[in-house]
Swiss-Prot record:
The chain crosses the membrane at residues 282-302, 309-329, 344-366, 383-403, 427-447, 453-473, 518-538, 664-684, 691-711, 722-742. It comes from the Bacteria. Gene3D superfamilies: 1.10.287.1770, P-loop containing nucleotide triphosphate hydrolases (3.40.50.300). This is Fe(2+) transporter FeoB. InterPro entries: Fe2_transport_prot-B, Fe2_transport_prot_B_C, FeoB_Cyto, FeoB_GTPase, G_FEOB_dom, Gate_dom, P-loop_NTPase, Small_GTP-bd. Belongs to the TRAFAC class TrmE-Era-EngA-EngB-Septin-like GTPase superfamily. FeoB GTPase (TC 9.A.8) family. GTP 3 binds at D56, L57, P58, G59. The keyword Metal-binding does not apply. It holds the Pfam family FeoB_C. GTP binds at N120, M121, L122, D123, V149, S150, T151. Residues 3-169 form the FeoB-type G domain. It comes from Salmonella choleraesuis (strain SC-B67). NCBIfam families: feoB, PRK09554.1, small_GTP. Its main location: membrane.
């Protein structure tokens, strides 16, 4: 079979991702475009005659980049197409918005690269009474047009057949430009490298006249002639870019008049009716908060019901199984404990997180595909404008509920460097899925019937602190107003199940692999460090270990937030949590249960793997049956506790060490707000600079320590009024000093602000193929 590379390109919300998932299934690979942290997805699929590599390009409305401060999506899409790597392009077009989508189509066809138009969302178009003559559209465009409903898989085989039959586009002169424009485009084309096809050279000439800044990198000596061409055009027309765009829109209008009835189409009545409620200025925000609470509720309920299968199953295989192997093969006791507690305990920490994190990713994917996520940005626009940000900046922040890394990377969709940087600084405060795992454990141990409210309050607190961080930046070092916010609101539709599953699987797989590697390594390290004293001797009591000795020296620093000296395990959890937040659970689980593992004698004669796995299945089935009872729906956290006794095990030790719910909640505030994990730090450094990464770390530590101290000292004021008063005053004075210093630093920071993405944008200013 012949190999074929195809670029998949289209407007945002045109169904491009759904089509990509339909064609490639699970055969996908996610990486980054060279030099930037913009996600690059590739997938594999086969037709009758070809083995195809499909490259999913960023969604874009146009290939024209007017400013270096614009979104990176247009830059990457344009440079990939011009690199010549793609043998064929599939342009996904939203049939219900034909006129707007055809602007990108015309640019692709003018470039002369073989192209297939995938006319998607025909079901939505039909509901809006839109009729399109597909054959007439194909004739007018001079390329194949394949009707699709990608959410249902309709038209996929026809698309594969069109790929096998692909040829060069018919040489149809689509757009009739003014003669002066053609003359100057030809003049510029003659000065370009003759190895490039004439059609592409003329296209580059028009792009240069339109003001596209990156086409000059491909124009060679022609770039030096641009000023001459513009000077000649100035005598004949006011604005060449306006004339070029007008000629394209006239062509689009002429095509639509012939092939469709878009002028008489009816907007979706369902979408209009729902938007009257969802976008209501008074109801919009409460509805958004309810949706976020519902996401948390489902993650805890359904994810918690599936947890016994992953928890008890991993204990049976990776802890008891390792102990049985060690006993059978006569391993030394210290080695068996080390492997069971380190390797087995690490795996046992990761796997129980899978169902709850997976349910949250599934819910987020549903919100994105259904069309609600765009509405959430619109609802938050008024609040974001108060911060000097457009509502569009809230979209990457919402993504932060899943993971802060794509949240930071999502800031690239914003146009102004100031807006990107402010969004990046706010992103780490959004409570990610790994933090949910920590909150759920503490809620079950300390808050009982109020567990759901406690966890939800932490989510809201994260949003509030992100907003306050934005206000602080706006009034100190990043003053300015938001750019105008224009955003397309797609019609509501039922997401495709296959697409939801694939998106959830990709995110969950990334989480498990990333978290698993870190947790297992940390668990093994902690197990070793917890088995020896500072003098190198093996210890029987973990309180005599080197880890305990070092941690006790550091723990007094956290006394103001409620971490007592004997609770050195909590201090270790904070340090390991800087690598990955989910490691906090693994650390506490390893340390709080270490004595139990050392003290409990293992009898290999009593170990039966099959019985333990069957027990895990039975517990899971019982949990699923109980999941939707009224008591569980009203109390998801309490239900997730299961049948475990608080007096024993990790939860019992943790309850004794913290001593009160106030101390535990204060600890959770610190975990929510302090330094982001290593992956997020790296993303911040790549998207901005190491300096801004350092600022984010220091600001997060200050906010976390200050807020946790204020909460704990206020709630426990009656126990030690003098100490509490000193702590509260110290926090207030310190933050007043910090804010005054930031206000004074504004003039110096403004100069450096515009350069924060210079290293990122420059990747697209080189020669062809530099962005792939």
């Amino acid at each position: 079979m012949k190999k074929l590379t195809i670029g998949l390109i289209g407007n945002p919300n045109s169904g491009k991702t759904t089509l990509f998932n339909q064609l490639t299934g699970a055969r996908q690979r996610v990486g980054n475009w060279a030099g930037v942290t913009v996600e690059r997805k590739e997938g594999q699929f086969a037709t009758t005659d070809h083995q195809v590599t499909l490259v999913d390009l960023p969604g874009t409305y146009s290939l024209t980049t007017i400013s270096s401060q614009t979104s990176l999506d247009e830059q990457i899409a344009c440079h990939y197409i011009l690199s010549g790597d793609a043998d064929l392009l599939i342009n996904v077009v939203d049939a219900s918005n034909l006129e707007r989508n055809l602007y990108l189509t015309l640019q692709l066809l003018e470039l002369g690269i073989p192209c297939i138009v995938a006319l998607n969302m025909l079901d939505i178009a039909e509901k809006q009474q839109v009729r399109i003559d597909v054959d007439a559209l194909s004739t007018r465009l001079g390329c194949p047009v394949v009707p699709l409903v990608s959410t249902r898989g309709r038209g996929i085989e026809a698309l594969k057949l069109a790929i096998d039959r692909h040829n060069a586009n018919d040489n149809v002169e689509l757009v009739h430009y003014a003669q002066p424009l053609l003359r100057e485009a030809g003049f510029l084309a003659d000065a370009m490298a003759q190895e490039m096809p004439l059609q592409q050279r003329r296209w580059l000439g028009l792009q240069m006249l339109e003001g596209d800044i990156y086409s000059r990198a491909y124009a060679g000596e022609a770039a030096q002639n641009l000023d001459t061409s513009l000077a000649r055009l100035k005598d004949e027309m006011d604005d060449p870019a306006l004339h070029i765009a007008d000629a394209r829109y006239q062509c689009i209008a002429a095509i639509c008049d012939v092939v469709s009835n878009t002028l008489t189409a009816e907007p979706s009545r369902f979408t209009r009716a729902v938007d009257k409620i969802i976008l209501n200025r008074f109801l919009g925000l409460p509805i958004f908060l309810f949706v976020m609470y519902l996401m948390f509720l489902l993650a805890i309920n359904i994810g918690g019901a599936l947890q016994p299968l992953f928890d008890a199953g991993s204990v049976a295989i990776f802890i008891h199984g390792i102990q049985w192997i060690g006993y059978t093969l006569h391993f030394p006791d210290w080695l068996t404990i080390f492997l069971a507690q380190g390797l087995g305990g690490g795996i046992n920490t990761v796997l129980p997180l899978v169902p709850q994190i997976g349910m949250m990713y599934l819910f987020l994917s549903f919100l994105e595909d259904s069309g609600y996520m765009a509405r959430a940005a619109f609802v938050m626009d008024r609040l974001m404008q108060a911060l000097g940000l457009p509502g569009k900046s809230f979209v990457p922040l919402i993504v932060g509920f899943g993971c802060n890394v794509p949240s930071v990377m999502g800031a690239r969709t914003l146009d102004a460097p100031r807006e990107r940087l402010m969004t990046i600084m706010m992103a780490p405060f959004m409570s990610c899925g790994a933090r949910l795992a920590i909150f759920a454990v503490f809620a079950a141990a300390f808050f009982g019937q109020n567990g759901a409210l406690a966890v939800f309050s932490l989510y809201v607190l994260g949003i509030v602190m992100a907003v306050l961080t934005g206000l602080m930046l706006k009034h100190t070092i990043m003053r300015g107003e938001a750019s105008p916010f224009v955003m397309e609101l797609p019609v509501y539709h039922v997401p495709h199940i296959k697409s939801l599953i694939i998106q959830t699987w990709q995110r969950l797989k990334g989480f498990v692999l990333r978290a698993g590697k870190v947790i297992i390594i940390v668990s093994i390290f902690l197990s070793a460090f917890n088995s020896f004293s500072l003098s190198g001797k093996i210890v029987d009591n973990i309180n005599d270990s080197a880890l305990a000795s070092v941690s006790r020296v550091i723990t007094p620093v956290f006394k103001p937030i409620g971490v007592h000296e004997d609770n050195w395990q909590a201090t270790v959890g904070l340090f390991t949590g800087a690598m990955a937040k989910e490691v906090v659970v693994g650390t506490l689980n390893t340390l709080y249960t270490a004595e139990n593992i050392q003290d409990e004698a293992f009898n290999p004669a009593d170990f039966h793997l099959g019985d333990e796995l069957l027990g895990a299945v039975d517990d899971t089935w019982q949990s699923l049956k109980d999941t939707f009872s009224l008591s569980v729906l009203a109390n998801p956290i309490e239900a997730s506790k299961g049948d475990g006794e608080m007096a024993t095990g990790a939860m019992g030790v943790m309850d004794q060490k913290f001593g009160s719910a106030a101390a535990a909640y204060s600890y959770l505030i610190f975990v929510l707000l302090y330094v982001p994990c290593i992956s997020v730090m790296g993303a911040i450094a790549r998207e901005s600079s190491r300096g801004w990464m350092g600022f984010s770390i220091l600001w997060g530590l200050n906010i976390a320590y200050s807020l946790a101290t204020l909460f704990y000292q206020v709630t426990s004021f009656s126990q030690h009024p003098t100490y509490s008063l000193i702590c509260i005053l110290a926090v207030i004075v310190f933050n007043v000093v910090v804010l005054s210093l930031l206000r004074r630093a504004r003039s110096r920071v403004d100069i450096e602000l515009l350069a924060t993405r210079k290293n990122v944008s420059s990747c697209c200013s080189g020669t062809a193929g530099n962005c792939h």
